[in-house]
A protein has these predicted regions:
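A composition-driven surface/loop motif
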Residues: 1-223
């Protein structure tokens, strides 16, 4: 559960039908998905095409329980053709820059009960955690694209920094979750010259019109 994995160049960094992270430090740079959980043979990006591209696969899981995970992906950051469950750990995702992929991508459910995650990507296919979670999360699309290497900060109403990350790619959509988020509280998202506020009004707060159009398993419209 400890140790270091440093993948500096890959097509898909980590791939399997069930991927469980219980500790350690993992860093992935990929030309497609950072972590990909799928059943069947490896058919590359074509396994997402066809009539059943959004159907959930039985026995396919991505589980993050502990550890530190950093993803720099041209495709989906964290991709599960089944379920995604996060109970702990720290996760930072950078990418994708094209609207055909998402920082998070799942076909089943995405549940967060603990840990910290901040994931930045393009607008178009973005997804957040589902309302079956027990920890608050936000999926927020900014008004315009943020340049690469601009620091992103999430601060509370007192100006205390809750989360921060400096993506190395352009982005417009962010997913974040932390045990510090509280219902009814207002938080400020600052990135480059942009600054927007969001008020937590439920287990999932979202203004996204992405893959699930702000509803379904990606979470409801929050404001």
């Amino acid at each position: 559960s400890d140790g270091t994995v440093d993948i500096t160049k890959s097509y898909e960094g980590i791939e399997g039908s069930i991927v469980t992270i219980d500790g350690g430090t993992i860093s992935v740079v990929s030309s497609d998905d950072g972590i990909n959980c799928a059943g069947g043979s490896d058919t590359g990006s074509t396994d997402r095409m066809g009539a059943d591209q959004f159907s959930s696969q039985d026995g396919v899981e991505l589980n993050i329980n502990r550890g530190t995970v950093t993803i720099d992906a041209e495709g989906d950051g964290l991709d599960s053709n089944g379920n995604f469950t996060m109970t702990g750990g720290t996760v930072c995702v950078c990418g994708p820059t094209n609207g055909g992929n998402g920082a998070l991508d799942y076909n089943g459910t995405a549940t967060v009960t603990g840990g910290t995650l901040i994931a930045c990507g393009a607008v178009g296919m973005e997804e957040g955690f589902g309302d079956n979670s027990t920890q608050y999360s936000v999926l927020h699309d900014l008004g315009s694209t943020v340049s690469a290497n601009e620091k992103l900060t999430i601060t509370d109403s007192d100006g205390k920094e809750i989360l921060s990350f400096t993506p190395t790619k352009t982005w417009q959509s962010v997913v974040f979750t932390s045990a510090d988020l509280k219902e009814g509280e207002t938080y400020t998202i600052t990135a480059g010259s942009q600054s927007e506020t969001v008020t937590i009004d439920g287990i999932v707060t979202s203004n996204s019109k992405g893959k699930n159009f702000g509803g379904g398993h990606g979470g409801r419209r929050g404001f």
